[in-house]
């Protein structure tokens, strides 16, 4: 029994000695031993520093793992063998032209500017082609979709918009670019673009005009020998949003065409056209231009019903209508380009201006003839000597252009109601008629002299409206 106990105690001492020996040779992570009284403390620190240096020099325990966000792109590039090919050359270089199909979905037609002669359109532009260099093995025949980062590493068609003034690819929240690759190498390249392009407009029938604009797509570097550009599904390649509308235009039609463009320095290129026809809404211009002009012409006719002696009433009315017509013409031309030909709206406005101006000239003629009439009447009164009691009277008929003073001079006749009559008969007897046999043979006869300049206003009340109505019938039958 005692021997067994001694053996157990010996085993325990051996185990304890082995533990102490292990603690003196093994460094425990995160544990620091401070024994300044011992001489072996400095070598221990040196060994610890050497141990840390070993970790700093590339110990696999502290090696940082690669960025997992970049690993799918790297695997995709390896799967597509991006580094094994030269993508600066087009697919099938040296062979026939590579066919590139295009389809477009118009998202919005933002604005049409007559002054700048351009339009702004936002669209989805999609390209279709086959590049066998991008083919990859796939058991489920699924395509791979990428963003714009891969576009910079492979070959894509170098399309541009002919006659464009400004264009950009949308980048909210990221670049609106998508690349989809099929296992057999077929590629779909789609991007969202806003472009402002030129549109040659003809304003000879403005605002009753119809405009046709085109957005032209073409390869910048590759001629028809290298790249064959075509609409993938014909007219069905162009899709539009049904909600597209413009404030001043009605979109009548969208259609596609394909033509060849020739450049003397480089050759022939395939060019795709997106054509759309716009018809202008006339109601806005009826309210803003035609109706005010017609109203001013009709207002100028009011002067024909005003007494020709009322100069303060007729003159300001004529001047006001002329100035208003000038303002309307100036306002219309300010919103239009300075073209060298006459527009339909110019014809209407200038003819209306002529009618207004003629109404002013009409009153000038009436006023002048009235003044001449008064001068003749004054001379006539001076030649006639008024002698009471002469048996043979001669009648002089005057119209309403006489004044109150003239009535007193001609005998003091005035109706009971106090109003001036349109005509009055003044009985005058010449002294030389009493003893003349020739005058006696003419007793009882009267000579009437009628001077009536008011007839010009009466004729103008009919001629001016009739002529303006005839002009409107001809104008709207031609331009509508």
Swiss-Prot record:
GO cellular component, one term: postsynaptic membrane
Function: Rho subunit of the pentameric ligand-gated chloride channels responsible for mediating the effects of gamma-aminobutyric acid (GABA), the major inhibitory neurotransmitter in the brain. Rho-containing GABA-gated chloride channels are a subclass of GABA(A) receptors (GABAARs) entirely composed of rho subunits, where GABA molecules bind at the rho intersubunit interfaces. When activated by GABA, rho-GABAARs selectively allow the flow of chloride anions across the cell membrane down their electrochemical gradient.
Location in the cell: Postsynaptic cell membrane; Cell membrane
Signal sequence residues: 1-21
Entry remark concerning the domains of this protein: GABAARs subunits share a common topological structure: a peptide sequence made up of a long extracellular N-terminal, four transmembrane domains, intracellular or cytoplasmic domain located between the third and the fourth transmembrane domains.
PROSITE patterns: NEUROTR_ION_CHANNEL (PS00236)
Comp. bias (Basic residues): 39-48
Assembly mode: Three rho subunits (rho-1/GBRR1, rho-2/GBRR2 and rho-3/GBRR3) coassemble either to form functional homopentamers or heteropentamers. Rho-1/GBRR1 subunits can also associate with alpha-1/GBRA1 subunits to form a functional GABAAR. Interacts with SQSTM1.
Source superkingdom: Eukaryota
Keywords: Cell membrane, Chloride, Chloride channel, Disulfide bond, Glycoprotein, Ion channel, Ion transport, Membrane, Postsynaptic cell membrane, Signal, Synapse, Transmembrane, Transmembrane helix, Transport
Bilayer topology annotation: Multi-pass membrane protein
GO process terms (BP): chloride transmembrane transport; modulation of chemical synaptic transmission
Source organism of the structure: Rattus norvegicus (Rat)
Hydrolase found in the keyword field: no
Principal location class: membrane
The family this protein is said to belong to: Belongs to the ligand-gated ion channel (TC 1.A.9) family. Gamma-aminobutyric acid receptor (TC 1.A.9.5) subfamily. GABRR1 sub-subfamily.
Cytoplasmic domain ranges by topology: 303-314, 368-458
Protein's UniProt name: Gamma-aminobutyric acid receptor subunit rho-1
Molecular function as annotated in GO: GABA receptor activity; GABA-A receptor activity; GABA-gated chloride ion channel activity; identical protein binding; ligand-gated monoatomic ion channel activity involved in regulation of presynaptic membrane potential; protein domain specific binding; protein-containing complex binding
Residues that span the membrane, as ranges: 282-302, 315-335, 347-367, 459-479
Regulation: Inhibited by TPMPA, a rho-specific antagonist. Inhibited by picrotoxin, when forming a homopentamer. In contrast with other GABAARs, rho-1 GABAAR is not inhibited by bicuculline, when forming a homopentamer. Down-regulated by external protons when forming a homopentamer.
Glycan-modified residues: 141, 235, 275
Positions with a binding annotation for 4-aminobutanoate: 126, 190, 218
Reaction(s) catalysed (UniProt annotation): chloride(in) = chloride(out)
Gene: Gabrr1
